[in-house]
Amino acid sequence: MTSATIPGLDTAPTNHQGLLSWVQEVAELTQPDRVVFADGSDEEFNRLAAELVEAGTLKKLNEKKHPNSYLALSDPSDVARVESRTYICTEEESGAGPTNNWMDPTEMRSIMTDLYRGCMRGRTMWVVPFCMGPLGVEDPKLGVEITDSEYVVISMKVMTRMGKAALEKMGDDGFFVKALHSVGAPLEPGQKDVPWPCNDTKYITHFPETREIWSYGSGYGGNALLGKKCYSLRIASAMAHDEGWLAEHMLILKLISPENKAYYFAAAFPSACGKTNLAMLQPTIPGWRAETLGDDIAWMRFGKDGRLYAVNPEFGFFGVAPGTNWKSNPNAMRTIEAGNTVFTNVALTDDNDVWWEGLEGQPEHLIDWKGNDWYAGKTETPAAHPNSRYCTPMSQCPILAPEWDDPQGVPISGILFGARRKTTVPLVTQARDWQHGVFMGATMGSEQTAAAEGKVGTVRRDPMAMLPFLGYHVGDYFQHWIDLGKNSDESKLPKVFFVNWFRRGDDGGFLWPGFGENSRVLKWIVDRIEHKAGGQDTPIGIVPKAEDLDLDGLDVSVDDVAKALAVNPDEWREELPQIEEWFEFVGEKLPTGVRDEFEALKQRLSEAG
């Protein structure tokens, strides 16, 4: 088929010639049955959802329990981000750095063009315009995803500001990131479709220099919703490096003191370290309140007043379901209960409700994420996939901060780095200054989770929780952080802290209860920012004593809190060779400033006896 004979190409609702010529070029390559520009309307969402129910991709859930909500079960081979098939294709291999897979851009384009040839046959090609962040900003970060997946279209409506308004924002010549996606499953005439089309061959490719994303073979979240990690972190981190800002894997939290003073925090945690739970915190200490602005991504720029301001580029939550419950995260549960949610790979109850491991009230019988019968106490495999998800609108969150859609963003008082560590790392540590904070973030290590491929439980370095999401060389990224600090007024920079909710005692149990009780740690952090709280200088930074924390009403022994806060120089000396090994991996682009902090740490540990 030529472009002249592909229905929909001649009725595009835009005069943007750059967009139109790209859409035509992709249509001629991929050969869809028709082209449709998504408008982002509720009517479109409902129509597509109904079609996906008819096709067997979605199941409509119990309207009383989850209004306008659906469950999708993926192909068992397509359940998570595929880091082994994720590429950063810079002109020079050194541009991608040692943390990324690299291929020559010309070679990659050739391979993927062959894969794309005819790949949308028998399908509809959707043109999905979207905006990352509030539509009202001076310099909106726009994108267009071309996809052959209706699941992607409805998910993009939840996760981004998608459709007509974003297309209008582009005008006739506005810049946009080109994001091309196909499940790689063409249909021959008369061929029956499968509920979850995908391909064994997968590529999730980024071209940072030309701001393009090409994805093939996967229908799953992070590989297919290209506004998510692909744009808002991998491409945006390269943009941020070039333009002098930060695109980070961070939640944004607003904490309000009993005096009604607001503090805003950005916090970076690797997957499954409690990021969403902290973003939707319910403080347990009287008089303190929390509101959320985002649970996954923060874009931060310096304002005219010299402070660092953050916006959340996303429009929805794409959270891990297992472990989410009325105790760990009641606000996530309330957000989901409000409806308009697409669940993926959770279990289905007999009354068309959803269930996952960790959720209260385990039923006797379920249909598991593979579509099989599951019986409590008898079936040995999990009912929900460990990386199963809910995709739900942010606007439904009961503790959403009113500033969530403010183009100016919010001024950040503190940056938190965190990780999942059983030993060594205290409950909370304050960095001595910005550069020391960069060192803390650069050397983060966390135990592996189910959100990515790899062995669960092993510790891997995950700098600023950005290891899988950097769009350029990790050493240049560290230098970018240091430079932003050097070029700023230090008195206006956010204070930097490191937290670890997951330290364990000798009996293997958690020393700190976590969840809402983490507000006690945040209170100490606020008091440090206000120069009100005590803390002891240790070789690794400033750490509170147990009595420096507000422990009123906490059902944990002071002894356990002290153990959670302990700094053991011997354990930290064991950490040093691992950090050295990580720095060798980063290579010659490791900034001098980060190396200096490491040498200073070694010196302080040697003096600690």
Swiss-Prot record:
SUPFAM superfamilies: PEP carboxykinase N-terminal domain, PEP carboxykinase-like. The active site is at C273. The keyword Lyase applies. GTP binds at A272, C273, G274, K275, T276, N277, R389, R420, F515, G516, E517, N518. It is found in: Cytoplasm. Mn(2+) binds at K229, H249, D296. Its EC number is 4.1.1.32. Pathway: Carbohydrate biosynthesis; gluconeogenesis. Its cofactor is Mn(2+). GO terms for molecular function: GTP binding; manganese ion binding; phosphoenolpyruvate carboxykinase (GTP) activity. Monomer. Belongs to the phosphoenolpyruvate carboxykinase [GTP] family. This is Phosphoenolpyruvate carboxykinase [GTP]. The lineage of its organism: Bacteria, Bacillati, Actinomycetota, Actinomycetes, Mycobacteriales.
